Amino acid sequence: GVMPSVAALTGAGTLVVSIMAGKTLGFLEAGLPGAAIVRAMPNTPAAIGRGITVAVPNAAVNAEQKQRAHALLAASGAVEWIADESLMDAVTAVSGSGPAYVFLLAETLSRAGVAAGLPEDLAARLARETVAGSGELLHRSPLDAATLRQNVTSPAGTTAAALDVLMASDGLEPLMRRAVAAAARRSRELAG
């Protein structure tokens, strides 16, 4: 396995940063006794420097090592530190798996556009740019997502009609809660 080969490289002052999904600090510590370990969960937008990584250190990590880990992880985007490792399953479900949810939104928006009569290539471009632009607006704006949504919604307008469907009791929120719960449950299963 990988642990013996990593263990051979560790010594005093060595910092191990793990991005192995589902591998807890306890698992890592068992294979690397005494090592300073940071468990991290990045996401795929890290590939363009726009990811978010959530990290949790073990007790052996000192302040200088935490700063080094932060600098390393920050090269791929934002970094959030947590003290409670039990949150990592929910983190994995929200930000680790989250890009797939956004990509699925673009896919389904595109298909809905085709169903509404748009040519496939136009629907795909409109969906891609709408999702990308909205994400960038959310990123740059000081306003939260709810306020941005409200700002684009005219009373009794077209957006309001669509949101009535998406925000119904069986709409997007309960669906997303079930999806995130399923991903968190699977993360716990993978951890053993």
Specify the residue positions occupied by each region the protein language model found.
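Rossmann-like NAD(P)(H) cofactor-binding subdomain of soluble oxidoreductases
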Residues: 1-55, 59
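Hydrophobic alpha-helical segments typical of transmembrane helices
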Residues: 2, 24-27, 68, 109, ...
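Glycine-rich beta-strand-to-loop/alpha-helix junction loops that act as flexible
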Residues: 21, 96-97, 155
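Internal alpha-helical scaffold of NAD(P)-dependent oxidoreductase catalytic cores
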Residues: 27-36, 52-90, 101-140, 186
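Short pre-catalytic strand/loop immediately N-terminal to key active-site residues, enriched for Gly-Thr
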Residues: 38, 87-93, 145-150
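NAD(P)-dependent Rossmann-like dehydrogenase/reductase catalytic/cofactor-binding core
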Residues: 128-192
